[in-house]
Amino acid sequence: MSNDGENQNLYLKEEVYFEPLFNQWYAWPYLIPPVTAARYTDKTHLRIMKSFVNNYKLHILAAQESELSGGEFLNCSESEVEEIKSLIDRTETHYHDFLELSKAVSQLDKLLLNHTQGTSLEPLYQQVPDLLKGYVELTFDRHHRAGFRLLEPLLYQSKFYQPQLQTLSFGLMSKVNERPFVLSTPRLADDDHQQVNTHFNDRFVDEIFKSRTQPLSRTQVDALFAGKELSGGLAYEDLFTTQPPTHKPENVKDGVLLRYLGHAGFMVQSEYVTILIDPIIATRDEKIKDDIVSFTQLPDFIDYVCLTHTHQDHVNFETLLQLRHKIGKIIVPKNNGGELQDPSLKLMLQKLQFDTIEVDECEQLAIHSGIITSIPFFGEHGDLNIRSKSAWTIELEGKKLFFGADSANPDVNLYKHLTPYLTDLDVYAIGMECVGAPYTWLYGALCTAKVPNTIKDTRRLNGSDASQASEVVELIKPKHIFVYALGMEPWYKYFMGIEYNENSEQVQQIKQFSQTTQQWDIQVESLFAKRDLFLPNLG
């Protein structure tokens, strides 16, 4: 920054990217609830870091192979081995109770798996590990298999919810070639980053991100950073510029604007209402400056955000925390209530100071000149009992749009029952992640026993394929079809961990889907980077 006075207007640079961290790891949804955070810290983070320390040369070589970017290879240099050792030691020394909570889950699972006779569970309460006593209810399913239910609200009030492990990391796109994959590499305070030791609910977060469009004075910037514990070689002054943003929002005066935001994100906008679906906003830099919709192009107020499911590429705190100051309400699918693999999105978001509405399947929410409807979502979760997933239909100003994200169609009878909600669609948007990873890639840390390969290989994170999507289209005959949510954009590789080519099965399925829908004179468009569709008001 220049030295032109304390009251000079300063804006957060468009190329600034932000990563919310939990114990130096990228904070995806399962690192917010205490028990799942403990499991991933114990069974994923420590395991990968210890593997790196013991075999760092192998990790360094693997990290250079693009096709391995989504694997469990820690992307750090040999010079950072000692820092990883320190992070291991700090985690095991200072957060011993937290790790013991993870072990308590394993012990409780073992206790209940051994109770096979189907007799009352009441005597087992005395054998529940001490750290979980009073936080779990022991239950049977209808087939007399014992399990437990977590009391999530109480756990958020306990010592196991540790916001002191939350920190903020800032970087400049011009200083990095590629961001490491988020699920395999902790974020160290290196020369290219500024890390701020404060929790996600600090007003600092909202004030900083407001300054993308609402300038701060130098005095205000200094005051925000004053007293904060800072680490890393990037000076906070370098995050700001005197140049106001050149990319600004566009107003909608009539009809409905559908704007694709990249990956799984959409914006639906009328004159009076703005709705985002699964927003993941890319950071603008010189390489992609004209290819994306950036933070500065979003409206000053976002009435609703609809989230489809609790995967890191759909509930993205990197984006949501940057938008929190301008979000009205977040709408989320109803939760099972207490299942380890299915933490409550409502509780999670409320803990991060979002105004959150939880809706049941087929429940409708009235909005200005329209309705938001929760549509049942099957698939993409490895057959785990996870209820926190929903597709959405949005009716606005007489237009009707469906956003299916990664939902699959294993039984077309569901969509036959749903036709009253899906008739007269202007837009049918569906993902085609038909070759997902084994479910243990994402949920392995929650398993307390080794999962056989025969199970892993069949239970995958699969969404729709061409055949499944075509069955739905044949029923509902939408005007427009978009395929999206595949992570095609290379700038999202850091959280998707995948690359595609012409021979990729997903690409072949999109071609097959497009050929099939020609019989109904409906074109399929595969979305990439950004796309606008204006739906005029014909009334």
Predicted regions and their residues:
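Pre-active-site segment of Zn-dependent metallo-hydrolases
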Residues: N3-D206, D238-K253, M267-T310, F317-Q322, ...
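Metallo-beta-lactamase
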Residues: E229-K253, N335-K399, Q515, Q519, ...
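Active-site-proximal beta-strand elements of phosphoester/diester hydrolases
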Residues: L257-Y260, T274-D278, I371-F378, K400-D406
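Divalent metal-coordination and catalytic microenvironments
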Residues: V268, D278, H309, I330, ...
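Active-site HxH/HxHxD metal-binding segment of metal-dependent hydrolases
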Residues: V293-D360
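Active-site environment of divalent metal-dependent phosphoester hydrolases
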Residues: H311-V315, G337-L340, E363-A366, H381-G382, ...
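Active-site-proximal loop/helix segments of hydrolase catalytic cores
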Residues: H314, E318, F378-L475
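Short acidic, glycine/proline-enriched helix-loop-strand junctions
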Residues: K450-V451, I455-R459, E471-V472, I476, ...
